[in-house]
Each structure stands twice: as structure tokens, then as C-alpha cells.
Amino acid sequence: IQTNLWLRAADRIKIVVGSFPAKTFEELFQGVFALDWENYLPLGAKFPISKAKCVKSKLHNEPSVQAISKKAVVKKLQKHYARPEGVPLQENGAEFRIEVSILKDVATVMIDTTGSSLFKRGYRADKGGAPIKENMAAAILLLSNWYPDKPLIDPTCGSGTFCIEAAMIGMKIAPGLHRSFAFEDWNWVDKDL
């Protein structure tokens, strides 16, 4: 969870719930159902299947992948929490955005801990004209062999993204310090982190 606060060049941090072969919709359903959802999703959690991506796979209909994955999670939670099948689960608690990626017939199921992308640092209200994303500027600085004890020349000097990111690196300020994250509402995350 600290990774959301401190990683400068990442876009999102996801928890991998599991991976399994999925060449058919039945294999997808059984694979998602077999995962330990009760370790992540408390009773009442909202759990949209926010994204599905299929690449070089027999399964390629992404809306169907989302619908089948949602059905499998619902069935698993109904079983675990001893809820009747005909009664829908209440989804009025914290949100856990689930993503399903199928690459070469192997499904990977993840939960997004970040929420909005990590380039949104929270220090900028107006982006200015054509800025580089903050995480990209930080990545370029980290790869450029620049160190905080050396001068930094920013020839682009647009909206100041390179200079702001360099100052944050030099002063060891966490890039996620002034923003919120999806995981902050989860009951199993230590709030003192």
C-alpha cells in the first residue's frame, strides 16, 4: 500500500488475486469463482468489474468477460456469506475495482488499489498547455542520471512539471502525499500506514 504513496514513475498499483488458464467462458467462471474473494471483499463491498482486456486469446468479447467474472464473484460471495442465490448482494460499502486481463488464454484477475492514475499528484489544479504527465517526467528524471545535488536545466519550461518533480525527488517528498487512494476505504488496510 505504501507503493501508492512513494512510487514516482508508476501509473497504478494492482493486487493480483490470481491467474489461471481460461480458453472458455466456463473456465473463466470457474477460475474466478475459485479465487479467495472473501479475503478481499467484505460483505457489502462494491466490486465492479471495471476493466477487461483480451489479447491473443480465444475469449475476446470483453463485455462478456466482465459479466461472467462479475457473476462468478457474486456466486462465490453468496456462498461464503451464506446468502440465498435469489437475493442480490448489497453493494453499498467500499469500492474494490476488479480488472480481468486475458493474455494468450491465461486470465489474471486484479484489484486496483490506486483509484485515479498516480500521475495525478494533487498539487496541480490547472495543467497548463500540453504538459507531460507527472509520472513520465519523474521517470525521465530518474533515468537521466540527474541527482539532487546537481543543477537541473529544464529546456522545455512549459508548466514546470520537470522542476516540480525534481524538487520533490530532491526533498524526498512522497509524490502521493496530497491525494487519496482507492484502498483508503478498505476495512482490512491499516489506517496508520
Regions found by a protein language model. Give the residues of each.
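Non-catalytic nucleic-acid substrate-recognition regions in nucleic-acid-modifying enzymes
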Residues: 1-94
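A generic local secondary-structure boundary/capping motif
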Residues: 37-38, 88, 97-99, 143, ...
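A general structural motif
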Residues: 44-46, 106, 149
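Short loop/turn motifs enriched for small/polar and acidic residues
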Residues: 50-54, 101-103, 158
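Beta-rich nucleic-acid/ligand-interaction surfaces
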Residues: 91-100, 159-160
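C-terminal edge-of-domain segments
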Residues: 98-111
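SAM-dependent Rossmann-like transferase core, predominantly class I methyltransferases
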Residues: 109-143
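Conserved S-adenosyl-L-methionine
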Residues: 132-193
